Amino acid sequence: YSSIYDDSMWLVNLTENLLSITRIENGTMHLQMNAELIDDVFREAISHVDRKAAEHEISVELADDLLMAKMDVRLIVQVIINIVNNAIKYTPEGSHICLSAKKEKKMVRIRIADDGPGISDEAKLHLFDMFYTADIGKADSRRGLGLGLSLCKSIVDAHGGEISVSDNKPHGAVFSFTLPLEEVNFDHV
């Protein structure tokens, strides 16, 4: 039953990604922007990641206790899930995946770093292109169609942010994206 479940979840994710990309590109997706606490967003996303997450060490580091950003939380949770699921899929069992966030001027920078084998410079140039799949040397009969990171880019762009990938030192990958900062004002409490 495990493989049936895994295959059905793959189809559900594929369908959701295709629908989201289509809605974003044709302008029919309307963002429902609200101020959200980053810690809550991380917690929600981690609760929905791949069942193989237990084979990895996932941690959260926050620079500020009350860090908030303006977002459509449903879509940003989907971005985080896609990136974390990729980290789970393409890193060996026991790898560390760290989610972190910090304030940068009028934005919040969210980072998802892993200590896996990393991503080639050639692959980094195309990771966010629709239908691009990197040759990562890992056999997987359920290889993706190259939609997940393209969708992530479309969602982050729609929020007025930027998404990028870089090397993690000494090895691994870091995906980071920005969202508009929501200032917390205690004067009106």
State where each predicted segment sits.
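Short alpha-helical segment of the dimerization/phosphotransfer core of two-component systems
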Residues: 6-11
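Conserved micro-motifs of the catalytic ATP-binding
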Residues: 26-31, 68-71
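Conserved catalytic submotifs in the C-terminal HATPase_c
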Residues: 32-37, 57-67
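Short helix-loop "hinge" at the ATP-lid/N-box region of the Bergerat-fold HATPase_c
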Residues: 87-88
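Short conserved segment of the HATPase_c
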Residues: 119-131
